[in-house]
UniProtKB/Swiss-Prot annotation:
Gene (name only): rpsM
NCBIfam families attached to this UniProt entry: uS13_bact (TIGR03631)
Claim: RNA-binding is one of the keywords in the record: yes
SUPFAM superfamilies per the UniProt record, alphabetical: S13-like H2TH domain (SSF46946)
Gene Ontology molecular function, alphabetical: rRNA binding; structural constituent of ribosome; tRNA binding
The organism of origin for this protein: Chlorobium chlorochromatii (strain CaD3)
Region (Disordered): 94-125
Subunit architecture: Part of the 30S ribosomal subunit. Forms a loose heterodimer with protein S19. Forms two bridges to the 50S subunit in the 70S ribosome.
Family: Belongs to the universal ribosomal protein uS13 family.
Keyword Ligase found: no
UniProt xrefs under Pfam families: Ribosomal_S13
Record's keyword terms, sorted: Ribonucleoprotein, Ribosomal protein, RNA-binding, rRNA-binding, tRNA-binding
Stored PANTHER family: 30S RIBOSOMAL PROTEIN S13/40S RIBOSOMAL PROTEIN S18, SMALL RIBOSOMAL SUBUNIT PROTEIN US13M
Entries under PROSITE patterns matching the protein: RIBOSOMAL_S13_1, RIBOSOMAL_S13_2
Name recorded for this polypeptide: Small ribosomal subunit protein uS13
Length: 125
């Protein structure tokens, strides 16, 4: 089944498969299935056309998913950078935003290590 431009795994339960869509987590997936009247443990391959249509409608009406959600997140980050607040500066410098230490660690955010040459040792005579 294809939903919001994503191929959902047919062999997984509906509540888990829906989380493959960007912008839908476990809680949102449960809420969607509750509104559609579908059991959480029903597999995607077992869904009828009416049930699939109900899921699509609920997501289209109430949720921002995939490109729309990503775009909104990028816009929020760009706004922080434009107004020059602390969080925006941290984003601009590719450093952790939420107060984590950076003397050691923070490798994911900072990227691969850039070696800096140390002091040259004086040659003894």
């Amino acid at each position: 089944m294809r939903l919001a431009g994503v191929n959902l795994p047919l062999n997984k339960h509906a509540v888990i498969a829906l989380t493959h869509v960007y912008g839908i987590g476990r809680t949102s997936a449960e809420n969607i299935l509750r509104k559609a009247g579908i059991a959480y443990d029903k597999k995607i391959s077992e869904l009828s056309d009416e049930e699939a249509h109900a899921i699509r409608e609920i997501i289209a009406e109430e949720y921002k998913v995939e490109g729309q959600a990503r775009g909104e997140q990028q816009t929020a980050i760009k706004r922080l950078m434009d107004i020059g607040c602390y969080r925006g500066l941290r984003h601009r410098r590719s450093l952790p935003v939420r107060g984590q230490r950076t003397r050691t660690n923070a490798r994911t955010r900072k990227g691969k290590r850039k070696t800096v040459a140390g002091k040259k040792k004086a040659v003894k005579k």
